[in-house]
């Protein structure tokens, strides 16, 4: 188990705990709250599995509602830009899923910034740019 303890914890239900904690098992959050009671989890949470985040904020993953991550690549320049099709103003046949480069460093940058879900779509210069895809 992983314990993230002593931070300002905000959850999706509107709670905000000043001395809050998040308890994780594997990749799942199993409990959130305030003033963690170590005696309830004796033997299940060892010292190396505790992150003391005093003075920091702990937030749920953010969702990016409109972006071009992976289709206008940060490092590739024009060669990696699959965002726009300039032949016509209406391009509903374009699918972001077909253009995404999963190796684009923008995915790592988004994750480091706390973004865990991306709505990616083509066409910033078209009236109808194409079909979006949501990636988590």
Predicted features and spans:
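Short secondary-structure capping/turn micro-motifs that flank functional sites
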Residues: 38, 126-128
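Metal-associated gating/positioning segment near the N- to mid-region
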Residues: 56-122, 126
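Mobile "lid/hinge" segments at catalytic clefts and subdomain interfaces of large enzymes
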Residues: 128-136
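Extreme N-terminal starter segment of soluble prokaryotic enzymes
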Residues: 1-5
